[in-house]
Design a protein with these regions (language model features):
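Post-Walker A helix-loop "phosphate-sensing" segment adjacent to the P-loop in P-loop NTPases
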Residues: 65-72, 94-96, 196-199
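Short acidic loop-to-helix transition motifs that present clustered carboxylates
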Residues: 50, 81, 103-109, 183-184
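Pre-Walker A segment
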Residues: 1-76
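Conserved motor-coupling elements within RecA-like helicase/translocase cores
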Residues: 87-123, 131-137
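Flexible beta-alpha connector loops of hexameric P-loop NTPases
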Residues: 98-106, 147-159, 221-228
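SF2 helicase catalytic motif II
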Residues: 128-177
Length: 235
């Protein structure tokens, strides 16, 4: 239906999925390391600097899972992220892509739940999409795994979406990737004790530009009256 994916997305079967990019050497190495961890039935913590191409790895892994006849859950922390990701994934996965979050209408959420029962699918959603009637999940991706938006304290049920996603993947005999530039302490500890495998991306994707960082001394600007309210003129 129209809201599964962007309007420009076309109908697509799992055998017709075509990537619109190629992996760099660094990404290919990381891809192979991830597969080695999967062979050992270990979830993966993918730590990559901003602009290193983690999303491309997610997409390549999702394509492989769908091609093998299994389904994919791709978690994002906030609804605000969904539109950009929807456009990106929709171009590749077409009508296999299902969107699920609290801003969708109840009727639309029911449609997605029914589509999940039928499969095949890749669900892009916030933490509530964990509770869809998933079957045969081959891959669960938790993007920005450190984000506190994955935790629900109120109302009940109270849960951590990241940790619940790991359990969900295990129940289905699927693989799991937690991805971030700034890992949570829990995930780093799990890597340290061998519960997870850490894979790193330290290079920018195909020479993406480095971010310029400048430290501004606002106390000095205040003394010089170089402030506009709470912001320096440079900001």
């Amino acid at each position: 239906s129209e809201k599964n994916a962007p309007e420009e997305s076309s109908s697509c079967s799992k055998s017709e999925i075509q990537l619109d990019f190629s992996l760099s050497a660094a990404q290919t190495t990381a891809y192979e390391e991830i597969h080695k961890a999967f062979e050992n039935h270990n979830p993966v913590l993918l730590q990559g600097v901003t602009g290193s191409g983690k999303t491309e790895l997610h997409i390549a892994l999702a394509k492989e899972a769908l091609t093998r006849g299994r389904n994919v859950l791709y978690l994002i922390p906030e609804i605000a992220v969904s539109r950009q990701m929807e456009e990106r994934l929709g171009r590749i996965f077409g009508n296999l892509l299902l969107i699920f979050h609290s801003k969708e209408t109840p009727a639309r959420r029911l449609e997605v739940a029914n589509a999940v029962r039928r499969g095949p699918y890749i669900v892009l959603g916030t933490r509530s999409s964990i509770f869809l009637p998933h079957h045969d999940l081959g891959l669960v991706i938790v993007d920005e795994e450190h984000d506190t938006s994955y935790k629900q304290d109120a109302p009940a049920p109270r849960y951590n979406g990241r940790d619940t996603a790991l359990v969900l993947a295990k129940i289905h005999g699927g693989d799991a990737v937690l991805s971030t530039a700034t890992p949570s302490l829990e995930s780093l500890y799990n890597c340290r004790i061998g519960r997870m495998t850490k894979v790193e991306l330290t290079e920018k994707y195909y020479g993406a530009a480095e971010s310029d960082v400048e430290i501004i001394d606002t106390s000095a600007d205040r003394r010089k009256r170089g402030m506009a309210g709470s912001f320096s003129f440079k900001l």
